[in-house]
Amino acid sequence: GVSMTGIASAAVLPLDMKAAASTVKRENTRVAKLIGINKAARTTCVKPAGTTSLVLGTSSGIHAWHNEFYIRRLRVGKNEPIYKYLKENNPDLVADEYFRPHDTAVIEIPQSAPKGSILRTESAFDLLKRVKKVATEWVKPGHRKGSNTHNVSATISLKEDEWDKAGKW
């Protein structure tokens, strides 16, 4: 199947996701026939994609960007190739991990949300509306058979005074 990430970068929200899901199903049918396997029962989903979002320069899954500018920190073993490469070629990005300085490092990657991106200053209800939109316009149309569809993977954080409203929503 096809999973989307970077939704809060806001590029896909105005697009016709139902048509895109239809294209995914059609292409899955074509390729499945070509290689002699069954068509996928579920062809579309949304999940957080930490590493993918870093490589692509997007937000993670359906979640908002942390802020307009921020530092993203990743912990890595000092035996990993990425650590060795950055230590030699860009040492300003690498620091010893406080609790395990002997074998673990922290890579600090500056982030900048693109103009027009959704930031985490949005309300929980804005995120819920986005989850609903993507679930109904992307995930559900990509479902072929079976009682379980994929879901949009999301963490919704509610403030104390939002619980009742969220329950009614």
Predicted regions and their residues:
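Functionally constrained cores in energy, signaling, and assembly domains
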Residues: 10-12, 52, 91
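Internal maturation/activation junctions in enzymes
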Residues: 4-48
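Catalytic alpha/beta core of large soluble enzyme barrels
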Residues: 48, 57-169
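A glycine-rich phosphate-binding loop feature that marks nucleotide/adenosyl-phosphate handling sites
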Residues: 1-6, 37, 42-52, 98-112
